[in-house]
Amino acid sequence: MSENGTVRAMWTDAELDDALSALHKETEPPSADVRATLMLACRETPPKPRRRYTWAAATAAVAALTAGVLTIPGAPSAAAEALDSAAAHVLAEPDPRPGPGQFFYTSTRESAMASSMTSTGKPLSLLEESMTQLWVPAIRAEEWFVRSGQTGARKWLVGNEDLARREGDGGLLDPRVSRERVQRGLCGDFPDQRELGGTPDDGKPCGERYGHWEAPTPRFLADLPRDPDALYERLSKDAKGRGADVLRLASGVLRAAETSADLRAAVYRALVKLPGLDVTDNAANLDGRRGTALGLTEGDLRDEVIVDTASGRYIGRRSVLVKPGTGYWAGLQPGTVVEFTAVTLGVADKAGTPPAN
């Protein structure tokens, strides 16, 4: 789902790319999986500063956004220890499942960077925050409910609002992307999906839909191996061997409310096998919850998943710039967080109302 916009329940990467190319500039920001794909493209060859991407999400309440990332000596063994601890604890926790009339609940709060230039060529970058809340009924064929949109929270990284107003913001402060949107749909068939051309599972009975890593259905989750070696092999194959994509695909399963405890544990243990994975302790996420950040560096960015090893709960993910910023990242210092996502899972009694705890 979008951590900064609406839910995209059953899209393949190719279809998302096609849909994005046809989007009007007033379209709602796409989902987190779409934005993640775009972010990965940026890291290889950073584009010149330009008009904001309409998918850019938001933040203003991130603690220590530009704090440096500390890599701990002996990180591979530290990563294995942290992931094994998370796996053991998640198996010891009850596996929450909604009863009749209840809902799986997922709250995704995201901040991501948008970048542009003033009319005089000065770089501008800011973080904006978006919020998506999703309620999926215990019987998936029934009506789903999603509320999404930007919160209005904003933090400048390069430049400021006065400069943007005085010399032009290049579309960075476009108010049209800030509205909240509420949608309902049987089996997650939301109106925005039809606007973008539908999904590969359109027309199929709800129980026969398959989904993919970043929008998994019960069928997809059931087909994933629980053996860590086999699961890592599947992750690596589908990620085409790229470590950052392994983390992205694994995160799609970890943030899904319907993922069972045994599969979460298997994902943690599969990530132990990811070459180059290391640890940053005491990493704060968007909501201020603290956990262990496990990640790796490719190109200009360090990608991390953040886990509460004491409970096994997946907290979120973040991307950190590791080199002095150029191009799209112009003016940013190493250690700047350019994307940050926090996920909260639970069981709700009523669509539109978050769980009490």
Locate each region found by the language model:
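N-terminal export/targeting signals for secretion/compartment entry
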Residues: 1-88
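Intrinsically disordered, low-complexity prosegments and terminal tails associated
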Residues: 2, 63-357
